[in-house]
Amino acid sequence: MEKFTIYKGTSVPVMNDNIDTDQIIPKQFLKAIDKKGFGKNLFYEWRYLKDYDENPDFILNAPKYKKASLLISGDNFGSGSSREHAAWALSDYGFRAIIAGSYSDIFYNNALKNGLLPIKQPREVLNQLTKLSSQEEITIDLPHQLIITSLGDFHFEIDPIWKDKLINGLDDIGITLQYEEAISAYEQKNQ
């Protein structure tokens, strides 16, 4: 998993509440088990008209938001089914963090497990962030738990264990590999 310490990127506001995992990545695209390739179908029903013709009315298709890597959204983001593919699609598209009012618990944990930082903020802060220029870089300072913008700095909470995992780029396998020597010694001893 890629380390997440201090990240700078532009943002795109998709301010709907209750964006569910089927809207994030529809079920017809869930056949693969490799984490790559899902970004093309992120928000498929909203991004495309038919045959992958871009919907000019969907914000991600606006040229000024094409390189955005921070998603700002409303409450209850990632609700619905427990598909981990939703986090894969957001990451594969290029998002490194999501700033929303709240998340479904399963999506929140899936995002963290895949190196995608879900940040919770109150509606007042979300409304301020949507007023930023599409060209303004927002800084996410994970060690200090800050969102840094021209409008001010906004603190966010994160479980210290997840914070450490993200800063060190450690997923569950990476953590297990830290104990590889001890595991091997145990296996040798107990054969």
Curated annotation (Swiss-Prot):
* One GO BP: L-leucine biosynthetic process
Q: Which reaction does it catalyse?
A: (2R,3S)-3-isopropylmalate = (2S)-2-isopropylmalate
Q: Which Pfam families match?
A: Aconitase_C
EC nos: 4.2.1.33
InterPro entries in alphabetical order: 3-IsopropMal_deHydase_ssu (IPR004431), Aconitase/3IPM_dehydase_swvl (IPR015928), AconitaseA/IPMdHydase_ssu_swvl (IPR000573), IPMI_Swivel (IPR033940), LeuD (IPR050075)
Q: What EC class is this?
A: lyase
Keyword terms of this UniProt record:
Amino-acid biosynthesis, Branched-chain amino acid biosynthesis, Leucine biosynthesis, Lyase
Tell me if Cytoplasm is a UniProt keyword of this record.
Answer: no
**UniProt key word Amino-acid biosynthesis:** yes
Q: What residue intervals traverse the membrane?
A: none
Q: Which GO terms label this protein's molecular function in UniProt?
A: 3-isopropylmalate dehydratase activity
- Pathway listed: Amino-acid biosynthesis; L-leucine biosynthesis; L-leucine from 3-methyl-2-oxobutanoate: step 2/4
Q: Which GO terms describe its cellular component?
A: 3-isopropylmalate dehydratase complex
Q: Which family does it belong to?
A: Belongs to the LeuD family. LeuD type 1 subfamily.
Q: What does this protein do?
A: Catalyzes the isomerization between 2-isopropylmalate and 3-isopropylmalate, via the formation of 2-isopropylmaleate.
The cross-references to HAMAP family, in alphabetical order and at most eight, read: LeuD_type1 (MF_01031)
Assembly:
Heterodimer of LeuC and LeuD.
Q: What is this protein called?
A: 3-isopropylmalate dehydratase small subunit
